[in-house]
Amino acid sequence: LQTVVRETGIDIDDLRAPLDDEERSRIEQEGDCVIVLVDIPSLDEKDRYVTIPLGIYMTKQAIVTVCLEETPVLKAFMNNRVREFYTFKKTRFVFQILYRNATSYLRYLRIIDRKSEQIEEKLHISQKNKELIELLELEKSLVYFTTSLRSNETVLEKLLRTEKVKKYPEDDELL
């Protein structure tokens, strides 16, 4: 982190924010840096669906991302699986990250839906506590996802209203 602070001038406390798994989604301006914090879906060590923070920092010379773990949202960019992304078009790049994030939520929601249906079928047959507990875990995940998606929506709306970030005509297709 010290190298990133030295190279970009981003405050160390701002860089550490997404390393706190309780950090909330928001957008802030700190000097010349626009900070976008959003929640992304993830699986925890017990294979439960949770959300974790992703920090995106836009400075004049760079875009920096910070997350508690390696994420498929960013991996797609690193592996050149996203067409027409350019880091010099910073706002568009952020919109593409947010779009990928929304796609990840949809993928996880489809998985949760399938698992819920399977558990419900088992529950009709067995009527055991194990299936009820599994169903409750999935319900909890849905609450996390719903809360995070609402927060992410607020961040996106604020980002669209922010005049400090340059927007491109082709951004409309992502939105």
Task: Tell where the protein language model's regions lie, with residue ranges.
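Peripheral, non-transmembrane regulatory/ligand-interaction domains of membrane transport proteins
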Residues: 1-174
